[in-house]
From Swiss-Prot:
This is UPF0102 protein CPE1705. The lineage of its organism: Bacteria, Bacillati, Bacillota, Clostridia, Eubacteriales. GO terms for molecular function: nucleic acid binding. It comes from Clostridium perfringens (strain 13 / Type A). Belongs to the UPF0102 family. InterPro entries: Restrct_endonuc-II-like, tRNA_endonuc-like_dom_sf, UPF0102_YraN-like.
Length: 122
């Protein structure tokens, strides 16, 4: 099941990247990892760097995908974002923390993508 969930996650991230590029974002990083945490997608548009968490699900039985971005997960993303900005020397940008929710339909290849800008703040 874990392997299956990972492949759903990677597929959701690929769909998210395609969506963001169509919306005019440039992708800076995908799956950025450091000791502080991981960021699924880092993108930029209009001088705003977006740190994006992607949550993909087949069911809302465990709540909406965004609800799984807990306070501790938010802290890890924020710390990883600070580290990323520091090592890349990106000091003169606005930043934003977004969530992309993807709800897959079990009986078809359809899905719903919901882009939640400014989903949480520092």
């Amino acid at each position: 099941m874990k392997k299956y969930n990972k492949s759903i996650g990677f597929y959701g991230e690929d769909l998210s990247v395609s969506f963001l590029e169509k919306e005019g974002y440039s992708i800076l990083e995908k799956n950025f990892n450091c000791s502080s945490g991981e960021i699924d997608i880092i993108a930029i548009k209009d001088e705003i760097i977006s740190f994006i968490e992607v949550k993909s699900r087949f069911s809302n039985s465990f709540g909406n995908p965004k609800e799984s971005v807990t306070c501790s997960k938010q802290r890890r993303i924020i710390n990883a974002a600070k580290y990323y900005l520091h090592i890349k020397k990106l000091y003169n940008y606005y930043i934003r923390f977004d969530v992309i929710e993807i709800n897959f339909h079990i009986d078809s290849s359809k899905y719903e993508l919901n882009f939640l800008k400014d989903a949480f703040r520092v």
